[in-house]
């Protein structure tokens, strides 16, 4: 039996990597809640932006300090984007207490490195150790990125696009569904680009052809769809496919003004409203999510006002707004017209206030309706209350539906009436 204390920072793709890494240690893995009880302490880091780097470094330093006081010191392994961005050698010089540094680019070697350090046999292919509960799981369909946005560090950290073969993903999906998972969520740096590195023109459609008919799959959700890849043909395919696909579209437009988009090096720089209209032409009731960066170098008040009007006009159901931070080694960090930090934060907060009103109005429209709620977990504080999600709520990043009543338990799909709405959350009774 191997006791593991794990921390996964950053995006769902990191969570999948953590689950996979724990899976290579085989069926004898036992997750623990305290470092003192662990044989292995695993920290999977994020290095995408400066605040994530700071959080990752702080987490590692705090772990080192806690381990120093233990009578029996577990193995400390640090993996992920922080290692890929700054390199083993430099990090090891600063933090020699870490036993293993693991980069995403040598992920295939992780099993051997971990197994050798622990003195255990590894299991390849592994069975993922799920950390998301019984209801949903992420399926990472590719790694790396083929785009070159001027603000982004991902290509330098994770490399170019590498799609996972469809037969491997199908086998993983079958395994996850056999364990009771009801919702699969595709994640990648750009899900719409799946298969391009393999020479496939319609790679995502080919993958969906294999996965949508699988027994036990009740929801399939696509995240991280770059605007340029969401063409009319793919949308028609998704419409014709129907359930279990849910018409939830996560489309990171990043900005709305063509001047800013051009400096960002973004595809679809002319008018992101075109892709919104394209989706709504095929799916009038689609749930739309996007992410926005404010305060990008050269963003004027006029650019920001244009962006605000865009958000007000489109009325995204879900919106994430981030203040631009200059990342070392990116073209944008050296661009003229850097915006004052206080101004960037003000623009972010003001745009989120606009979105809060939009979200509240949209969710109020669901009051009195019946929706299928996938129950994720029991509420941590209120007995009898559970936390779940409708089809238009993705885990971890969107609001939730608080639900109670007959048949409500983790992993269940329950028909329920929406009885109350809040700014970002719903309340339902089965």
UniProtKB/Swiss-Prot annotation:
Its cofactor is [4Fe-4S] cluster. Residues 2-119 form the MTTase N-terminal domain. Its EC number is 2.8.4.4. CDD domains: Radical_SAM. [4Fe-4S] cluster 2 binds at residues 145, 149, 152. [4Fe-4S] cluster 1 binds at residues 11, 46, 81. InterPro entries: Elp3/MiaA/NifB-like_rSAM, Methylthiotransferase, Methylthiotransferase_CS, Methylthiotransferase_N, Methylthiotransferase_N_sf, NA-bd_OB-fold, Ribosomal_uS12_MeSTrfase_RimO, rSAM. Keywords: 4Fe-4S, Cytoplasm, Iron, Iron-sulfur, Metal-binding, S-adenosyl-L-methionine, Transferase. SUPFAM superfamilies: Radical SAM enzymes. It catalyses: L-aspartate(89)-[ribosomal protein uS12]-hydrogen + (sulfur carrier)-SH + AH2 + 2 S-adenosyl-L-methionine = 3-methylsulfanyl-L-aspartate(89)-[ribosomal protein uS12]-hydrogen + (sulfur carrier)-H + 5'-deoxyadenosine + L-methionine + A + S-adenosyl-L-homocysteine + 2 H(+). GO terms for biological process: tRNA modification. GO terms for cellular component: cytosol. It is an enzyme of class 2 (transferase). The keyword Phosphoprotein does not apply. SMART domains: Elp3 (SM00729). Pfam families: Radical_SAM, TRAM_2, UPF0004. Residues 364-430 form the TRAM domain. GO terms for molecular function: 4 iron, 4 sulfur cluster binding; aspartic acid methylthiotransferase activity; metal ion binding; protein methylthiotransferase activity. Binds 2 [4Fe-4S] clusters. One cluster is coordinated with 3 cysteines and an exchangeable S-adenosyl-L-methionine. Residues 131-361 form the Radical SAM core domain. Belongs to the methylthiotransferase family. RimO subfamily. Catalyzes the methylthiolation of an aspartic acid residue of ribosomal protein uS12. This is Ribosomal protein uS12 methylthiotransferase RimO. It comes from Oleidesulfovibrio alaskensis (strain ATCC BAA-1058 / DSM 17464 / G20).
């Amino acid at each position: 039996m191997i006791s593991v204390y794990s921390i996964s920072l950053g995006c769902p793709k990191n969570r999948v990597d953590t689950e996979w890494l724990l899976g290579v240690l085989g069926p004898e893995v036992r997750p623990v809640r305290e470092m003192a009880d662990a044989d292995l302490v695993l920290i999977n880091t994020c290095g995408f932006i400066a605040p994530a780097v700071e959080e990752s470094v702080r987490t590692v330093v705090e772990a080192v300090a806690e381990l120093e006081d233990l009578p029996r010191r577990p193995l400390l392994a640090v993996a992920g984007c922080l290692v890929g961005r700054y390199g083993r050698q430099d990090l090891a010089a600063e933090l020699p207490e870490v036993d293993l540094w693991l980069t995403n680019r040598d992920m295939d070697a992780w099993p051997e490195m971990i197994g050798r350090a622990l003195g255990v046999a590894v299991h390849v292919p592994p069975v993922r150790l799920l950390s998301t509960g019984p209801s949903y799981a992420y399926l990472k369909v590719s790694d790396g990125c083929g785009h070159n946005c001027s603000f982004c560090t991902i290509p330098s950290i994770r490399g170019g696009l590498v799609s996972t073969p469809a037969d491997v993903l199908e086998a993983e999906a079958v395994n996850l569904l056999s364990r009771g998972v009801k919702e699969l969520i595709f994640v990648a740096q750009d899900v719409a680009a799946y298969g391009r590195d393999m020479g496939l023109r319609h790679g995502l459609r080919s993958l969906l052809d294999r996965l949508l008919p699988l027994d036990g799959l009740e929801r399939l959700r696509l995240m991280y769809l770059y605007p340029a890849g969401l063409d009319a043909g793919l949308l028609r395919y998704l419409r014709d496919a129907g359930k279990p696909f849910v018409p939830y579209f996560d489309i990171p437009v990043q900005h709305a003004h063509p001047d800013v988009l051009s400096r960002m090096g973004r595809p679809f720089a002319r008018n992101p409203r075109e892709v919104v209209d394209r989706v709504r032409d095929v799916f009038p009731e689609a749930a739309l999510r996007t992410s926005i960066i404010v305060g990008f170098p050269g963003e004027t008040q006029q650019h920001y006002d244009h962006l605000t009007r865009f958000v007000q006009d489109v009325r995204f159901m879900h919106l994430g707004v981030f203040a631009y931070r200059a990342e070392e080694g990116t073209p944008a960090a050296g661009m003229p017209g850097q915006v004052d930090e206080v101004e960037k934060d003000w623009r972010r907060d003001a745009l989120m206030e606009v979105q809060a009103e939009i979200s509240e109005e949209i969710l109020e429209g669901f009051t009195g309706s019946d929706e299928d709620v996938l129950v994720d977990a029991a509420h941590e504080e209120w007995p009898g209350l559970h936390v779940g999600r409708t089809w238009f709520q993705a885990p971890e990043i969107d609001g939730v539906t608080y639900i109670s009543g007959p048949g409500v338990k983790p992993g269940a799909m329950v028909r329920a009436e929406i009885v109350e709405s809040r700014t970002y959350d719903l309340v339902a009774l089965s």
